[in-house]
């Protein structure tokens, strides 16, 4: 009987704990859930909004593309001790095409190294999941991975940044707002947005949302045209170029040049 | 104003490609070169990937060379017969060159040799052209536009001229053997394919010094050749890599078609040796840039596969 009571109490406690945990989780909101790429698109702003006690807490937002990439690069090495050349192929498998981490304070001040590693929140920990080949040894793998990060960062596809946050109101009615720049380099697709709520170097809650980036209108039409009707698209591109060239020629002729 | 490029998958200030197109278009109209050596790195600086930059540049060159070719045709500077013969040669050379690259790569370290040979060759062409044009300018040979040449060159030129299948290129006003024209086109096409370049820098000196075509006709005829080469490249890039961005290309050729017209009218006001010395200077600048690219330590030690 005692054991039964204990089990019931434990179940209620766990359920209660789960609901408290979910209190934040359910109230996090990501706006917009769909980012539309039109002709004048130049990136967007992503807002993370939450309700609850946010004072004195820290937040980490990890955005990564759901699509894992298989990328082939060329190594740049000094050949014959003379010139820098693109040499052999280098394959990166199982890497997210897009990987951004935002935090309200520097990561190492918010979480322990173990937690950062367990949750894949640094570029170094991400490396463990990546299949990189061919490499001679671990040193070369580390070096090439750093170069990969540099390349991705150059095109704003990988980034780490400390962002400010707004926590307004009192007690449980506080409103949290974090604004994140969404780079225009992020291609269409689905993105997983993971929000970590942290207090005293402990993760209190993790929430996941999906943001979809989609092409619309003329941008979508032209992409589909280029992909699905490549030959007609190529001929069309040539015709437009030829017409433009001759048209400008005619205009200049009329202009008396 | 920013616009989104559907194939390049990036947003760009539309003013930038327009200005880049305008600048490269002037060079194209002036010298009859495609300008890929300048445009592709410029596009990469704007955040366009190397594959899309190279493919879209080819599409842009179609418009610029059509515009420039039309402008030169109006003033009687395009020798279509000569252009077609050189095209036959360079297309065949291109096909052989692509196969040859595969063989060379299989032998190992071919890329290094190819790169070094290209730099040396450009350097020699640029220097010789510069010296010759400078001495021509000094001597003020302005009465007749003729490409001066040394005794050795004259002997070689005579040999080329004496080959069978003689034909008269009326616009260029030169008698040449059809075999030598097609053969030289083939060599340029072969070298261009091996070195992965458009070939304008090689075709212009070949026409000036070996076929003895007047500089103004060289520019017009070279544009005619570049036009057809880039039509082929644009269609191939569309089909094989899906890498031609039509919006970016339109922005580029809005500038380059106008630039090519201006380049052609500036060129008409310059003498042959003046044009040659400016082109020689540009070839030398490109050579120096290539040497720096090859010798300076890069900022990132990996690069995406594809592109130039």
Question: Which role fits each region the language model picked out?
Answer:
Chain A
Residues 181, 202-235:
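Short, aromatic-rich amphipathic segments at membrane interfaces
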Residues 1-10:
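Bacterial N-terminal signal peptides that target proteins for export
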Residues 26-42:
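N-terminal edge beta-strand
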Residues 189-195:
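A short tyrosine-centered beta-strand micro-motif
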Residues 241-257:
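Juxtamembrane interface at the cytosolic side of transmembrane helices
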Residues 84-182:
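Membrane-proximal low-complexity regions enriched in glycine and acidic/polar residues
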Residues 20-25:
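Sec/Tat signal peptide C-region and signal peptidase I cleavage site
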Residues 47-53, 179-181:
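Short edge beta-strand/loop segments characteristic of extracellular beta-sandwich folds
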